[in-house]
Regions:
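Non-ligating segments of multi-cofactor redox enzymes
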Residues: 1-116
Length: 116
């Protein structure tokens, strides 16, 4: 099974993935294949594990419109969101291979979608 690995610690919230996906799928206003949500900013009274005092994160999520760009990936290309990520914090591949890139130094998530 294939998916997208996101190191969301480095996502800048630029929305390039949203724009590229939306254009590729030809989605109307208000619909998305991938949607970046903002979490924060909020302040910790105590910094967990020596982290920053403030939390301000952007987290991408796939919607039901996402096809993982099957038309592109079948030709060996990357999904549009991965190709256009300005922070280079997204990777596409087999989930088993993506998991090997996960370490304890950063914050990751793996995004998948169901077959239609």
């Amino acid at each position: 099974m294939k998916g997208i690995l996101v190191n969301y610690e480095f996502c800048t919230g630029c929305h390039s993935c949203e724009v590229a996906c939306k254009k590729h799928l030809g989605l109307p206003e208000g619909e998305f294949g991938i949607k970046v949500s903002e979490i924060g900013p909020y302040e910790y009274e105590e910094q967990p594990r020596g982290s920053e005092k403030w939390e301000w994160t952007w987290v991408p999520a796939l919607t039901k419109a996402c096809t993982l760009c099957e038309d592109r990936t079948e030709k060996g290309k990357m999904p549009m969101c991965v190709q256009h990520c300005q922070a280079w914090c997204m990777a596409y591949g087999e989930i088993e291979d993506l998991i090997r890139h996960v370490d304890e130094k950063s914050r990751y998530m793996i995004l998948t979608n169901r077959k239609r």
